[in-house]
Amino acid sequence: MARYEDLPYRTCVGMMLINRAGLVFIGRRAGGIEHVDDTHVWQMPQGGVDPGEDTWEAAKRELYEETNVRSVEKIAEVPDWLIYDIPRTVAGRAWKGRYRGQRQKWFAIRFTGQDSEIDIIAPPGHKSEFTSWRWEPMLNLPDLIVPFKRPVYERVVKEFSQLAIAV
């Protein structure tokens, strides 16, 4: 097995889905290796980018796979790739030990549909990523995520804070 330091980062997208009230969609993770405690189980949708796939197309695909949502408009993008390392204690189990963390392109996305469009229990053709969901004020997000992802969430909130307004 490769040394932790030599492992690459998994290329991913993250989506901050903002409703008309300026609140952000968060889902309660369905367990997994990232489960630290019952306080830090909430996160925004995120997922891998397929080889050759455009990041915006990947964001729309992943959002649909995790939430069933298609009624969206892209409103902003973090210009940089944001990176986090997973703890060494779980690195061998996460993604079959192939990655040391993720390199993510983040998008702010306006949700233009109705809440009834959201379906996390039976997403189209995929296993559920979340067990429940809610709309949350943007500034609360860093306190709800697992600690090793917190710096990424702090940066995303800083980049998109002006978007947390009702429209």
From Swiss-Prot:
InterPro entries: NUDIX_hydrolase-like_dom_sf, NUDIX_hydrolase_CS, NUDIX_hydrolase_dom, RppH
PROSITE patterns assigned to the protein according to its UniProt record, in alphabetical order: NUDIX (PS51462), NUDIX_BOX (PS00893)
Keyword entries, A-Z: Hydrolase
Entry keyword Hydrolase: yes
Keyword Aminoacyl-tRNA synthetase among record annotations: no
A Gene Ontology biological process term: ribose phosphate metabolic process
Annotated motif Nudix box, positions: 47-68
Gene3D superfamilies: Nucleoside Triphosphate Pyrophosphohydrolase
Superkingdom: Bacteria
Protein name: RNA pyrophosphohydrolase
Species: Rhodopseudomonas palustris (strain HaA2)
